[in-house]
Amino acid sequence: MRALWIMAVLLLGVEGHLMQFENMIKKVTGRSGIWWYGSYGCYCGKGGQGLPQDASDRCCFVHDCCYGKVNGCDPKDDFYVYSSENRDIVCGEDNPCTKEICECDKAAAICFRDNMDTYQNKYWFYPSSNCNEESEPC
């Protein structure tokens, strides 16, 4: 029951395009991004520090790095256009900045799908106090 309450609170914090990212993850992996990756390891969810704990957490680390390279728009608020067919995502956008956001999200969703076998429940709601190592450069 506590986990459901926490997920409800996390959903309240999802704004703008982050719901698009949630939908994209669900289309590519068949899983809810908020439920499975909303608070996972050292990088999935809000913030990020230390070293990624496994390949799934590394997907979030790389996603954070990708967002850090986006210039001219806000990756967490700006909307983009994409289509999907059979779990394939096509970012279709005239605006190069929002297309870049879409490509970051697409890469993360594919990474989650390709690394689903690395997901470990012990990293779900992993305490940030365990993420004290020096972070890798992007």
Swiss-Prot record:
Binds 1 Ca(2+) ion. Its EC number is 3.1.1.4. The keyword Transmembrane helix does not apply. Ca(2+) binds at Y43, G45, G47, D64. Expressed by the venom gland. The active site is at H63, D105. Its cofactor is Ca(2+). Gene3D superfamilies: Phospholipase A2 domain (1.20.90.10). One of its GO terms (cellular component) is extracellular region. It catalyses: a 1,2-diacyl-sn-glycero-3-phosphocholine + H2O = a 1-acyl-sn-glycero-3-phosphocholine + a fatty acid + H(+). It is found in: Secreted. GO terms for biological process: arachidonate secretion; lipid catabolic process; negative regulation of T cell proliferation; phospholipid metabolic process. Belongs to the phospholipase A2 family. Group II subfamily. D49 sub-subfamily. This is Acidic phospholipase A2 Ts-A6. It comes from Trimeresurus stejnegeri.
